[in-house]
Amino acid sequence: MSLVLLPAVDVANGEAVRLVQGEAGSETSYGSPRDAALAWQEAGAEWVHLVDLDAAFGRGSNRELLAKVVGELDVKVELSGGIRDDDSLEAALATGCARVNLGTAALEDPQWCARAIAKHGERIAVGLDVRIIDGDYRLRGRGWVSDGGDLWEVLERLERDGCSRYVVTDVTKDGTLTGPNLELLSEVCAATEAPVIASGGVSAIEDLVAIAGLVPEGVEGAIVGKALYAGRFTLPEALAAVR
């Protein structure tokens, strides 16, 4: 079983951008989301991780644009950002994406999240955005600016709800090119039977090989963003290294 790579396309104000540690205002633009997503498809991606940053930060949305991008792609799409009620969830699923990633909503509205998981099963993943504070694993919500509670308590609840997949991000690592938090990934894998997608910190092929080493523990994939855009390695190189 090889590691699945999900190149990220983060969208703000209709453009593909990258952030540093999820901070609003730290965007670097990379042009059209459509072109970025199609480029990853042409380079051999089987998945694209597509994020509506404006919706995630609660400052508008790129819903129509993202629906068009999903429609043009032949590969599977994981859609994320601002999916926190029936309206945004149904709109996201209606794009034809393979699955959606719930973030803040899963923390703030447990009942709604449980219903979404029960109704849509495999098409729902939950994003666990973790910041380590004084040795405690705390979750972050609303574009990473609010506290979302203790990681292990929330994970226990989501396990009871039957969540099919988790996207785990160490917020301190995201967009920094400082390497992934392998210990966090390993600990989450030990606490769930569900597959885990790693996110944040990948800076070199070696990081992906290290994450691939956790596949037997339950890591299924890795989201890669800034390292690809910054030219640290190409997607074909990365795919070859983890096959």
From Swiss-Prot:
GO molecular function: 1-(5-phosphoribosyl)-5-[(5-phosphoribosylamino)methylideneamino]imidazole-4-carboxamide isomerase activity; phosphoribosylanthranilate isomerase activity
Provenance organism: Nocardia farcinica (strain IFM 10152)
Coiled-coil intervals: none
The enzyme's E.C. designation: 5.3.1.16
Record keywords, A-Z: Amino-acid biosynthesis, Cytoplasm, Histidine biosynthesis, Isomerase
Active site: 10 (proton acceptor), 129 (proton donor)
Gene: hisA
Domain of life: Bacteria
Principal location: cytoplasm
Top-level taxonomy: Bacteria, Bacillati, Actinomycetota, Actinomycetes, Mycobacteriales
Catalytic reactions of this protein: 1-(5-phospho-beta-D-ribosyl)-5-[(5-phospho-beta-D-ribosylamino)methylideneamino]imidazole-4-carboxamide = 5-[(5-phospho-1-deoxy-D-ribulos-1-ylimino)methylamino]-1-(5-phospho-beta-D-ribosyl)imidazole-4-carboxamide
Similarity comment: Belongs to the HisA/HisF family.
Name of the protein this chain belongs to: 1-(5-phosphoribosyl)-5-[(5-phosphoribosylamino)methylideneamino] imidazole-4-carboxamide isomerase
The keyword Isomerase appears for this protein: yes
Matches recorded under PANTHER family: 1-(5-PHOSPHORIBOSYL)-5-[(5-PHOSPHORIBOSYLAMINO)METHYLIDENEAMINO] IMIDAZOLE-4-CARBOXAMIDE ISOMERASE (PTHR43090:SF2)
